[in-house]
Swiss-Prot record:
One of its GO terms (biological process) is olfactory placode formation. Gene3D superfamilies: Homeodomain-like (1.10.10.60), lambda repressor-like DNA-binding domains (1.10.260.40). Residues 80-97, 357-372, 519-580 have a biased composition (Low complexity). It comes from the Eukaryota. InterPro entries: HD, Homeobox_CS, Homeodomain-like_sf, Lambda_DNA-bd_dom_sf, POU, POU2F1_C, POU_dom, POU_domain_TF. Keywords: Activator, DNA-binding, Homeobox, Nucleus, Phosphoprotein, Transcription, Transcription regulation. The modification Phosphothreonine is found at T271, T277. This is POU domain, class 2, transcription factor 1. Residues 281-355 form the POU-specific domain.
Amino acid sequence: MNNPSETNKSSMESEDASTGTQTNGLDFQKQPVPVGGAISTAQAQAFLGHLHQVQLAGTSLQAAAQSLNVQSKSSEESGDSQQSSQPSSQPPSVQSAIPQTQLMLAGGQITGLTLTPAQQQLLLQQAQAQAQLLAAAVQQHSASQQHSAAGATISASAATPMTQIPLSQPIQIAQDLQQLQQLQQQNLNLQQFVLVHPTTNLQPAQFIISQTPQGQQGLLQAQNLLTQLPQQSQANLLQPQPSITLTSQPTTPTRTIAAASVQTLPQSQSTPKRIDTPSLEEPSDLEELEQFAKTFKQRRIKLGFTQGDVGLAMGKLYGNDFSQTTISRFEALNLSFKNMCKLKPLLEKWLNDAENLSSDSTASSPSALNSPGLGAEGLNRRRKKRTSIETNIRVALEKSFMENQKPTSEDITLIAEQLNMEKEVIRVWFCNRRQKEKRINPPSSGGTSSSPIKAIFPSPASLVATTPSLVTSSTATTLTVNPVLPLTSAAVTNLSLTDQDLRRGCSWEVLRSLPDRVTTTAGTTDSTSNNNTATVISTAPPASSAVTSPSLSPSPSASASTSEASSASETNTTQTTSTPLPSPLGASQVMVTTPGLQTAAAALQGAAQLPANASLAAMAAAAGLSPGLMAPSQFAAGGALLSLSPGTLGSALSPALMSNSTLATIQALASSGSLPITSLDATGNLVFANAGGAPNIVTAPLFLNPQNLSLLTSNPVSLVSAAAASTGNSAPTASLHASSTSTESIQSSLFTVASASGPASTTTAASKAQ
């Protein structure tokens, strides 16, 4: 190798610019350039050793570096086999002289460097080694990626400033020399290249170098190598060397080799991006397909074709059978874009043909659509067009249906003429509407709900417990139950009880309207019940004479007396019970306890499938007195809690007294009666009296004790007040008396009306009627 002292031999060339030499078929022209500096032979060798990506032609070597200006002289190899390939027109003086090789640099400056023959031989060997590596890569395409990676590493090293290049070369140079000798023996023509720095604005036309056909053939081989390399490997190869690039362009008969700028490199080397024109137009195509599918479905339904008919007709016409599912998926946009694009022209053609044939055959025959042109077999079996009824017509039909659910043929014809509809359509609509009505309101199996239910239950036992003070009889025991509607109903119902222990029948009437005042009160413990009676207007005549009972004062109990009067006679009945109350009463409730009615209640339970403990509460529920009965288990056997409408009595009483509670009774208040609170007596009892001369439901004071009337308190209860004696009303006294000394001895009366509005409840036993 050359020592560094040989670098002193290099001097700046400023000789004539017209003298040219020819080496290996290449013409070089010397150019005067300013002196830029000299480099050592080792540095030149290191620089040339890294140019694995450079294509070389003959003995000419041209390299580019931004920070170096190098010009070297190359000598002609005497005795080399390549000298025989030199043109015979070369002057002898030029052959004996040492030719110079110019290295064209990026800055446009050229400097000459004179090298010894040994140095020139070394440079030539290195250049030939690079060409051999490139040719070997052509032959071995399987290892092209590895060569590309190695070239990328070497190119990156070549792109660095020369100051960073080591002065010593690896052992690879020796291997390259051996390969170069083999190439020289094969007389391989090397290619011609010009290196230009990427920042140079020179045009490729400035570097047109003529070469022999053998050189062109070698260049084509190199070009094929670059073409065969994968695009990804080229991209990886070009990324590490942004400062030195090479672009080859084929020309005829010459080859133009130039460098492109860094900015244009990715565009020239990488694969150009494909402009996907269909993708840009795809949204519009999708919109067009969607619109066509919607229009196709509407027009198909208008023509009266099913999806299956369309598929069969298209098979008859165009030879492509489509199933009903395919047509359905097309209309629902569930097919792929490609399949929809294929199917659209066929459907469009069929639709146009169908519409044209339909318009042509409208005047002639409605069945012309079943012609063979549209697939007669498929279209002959198509369904009848579905009838769509407008809203106003539907409302008119509903009104007609409410008037008459089963119209006659004449009625249907009249309705069809009025609505401008087909008679068959109207007939089918009424038939479907009747079926719908049956589903909504199924008919009851037990008959109509408006018909009364009457049942007679014989009772082997007596209705009322027999006591020595009561008069018995042998009258048969029957129980007649009719469904009792609420008090607001217009129906007149009754509940009649006939007992063998009673001389007469006790009838409770709930009338729609009464001409006079109707009151029912409970009498005192006085044995003369005639002084404490109230009149009840009833349509049922009396059955027998009055039956009285002895005084009940020895035993604290509650007695209830009901009277029934008519224009013919008057009957009074007194009944004694001794069933204690286990629980307090609630608001808007009537307590009825008659242990003697247990047997009849049991018979009613069996018939109505009621619970065993329903007792009279179940009877009242079955009779329709109230749907909101309390649980019968809270009361003694035979007791019932009848809850009536809160508005029957609460609307007539004073709001100050009623508050949120309601005094309820079996009978409602009279039409315009009121109960004003007149005064409080000395004992704290409330006194209700008539308001002036206006007609009133209460003809005599009604006494309430709000402090002591709670049924669970231990205080004695007294509803009889001295204020009753001071009343000057000449009408029959209507009063209620219930006395008790303890909770255990409290007896329940036949009619007990409770209103619990707070800790101290108010209780009255007055029953009114509407």
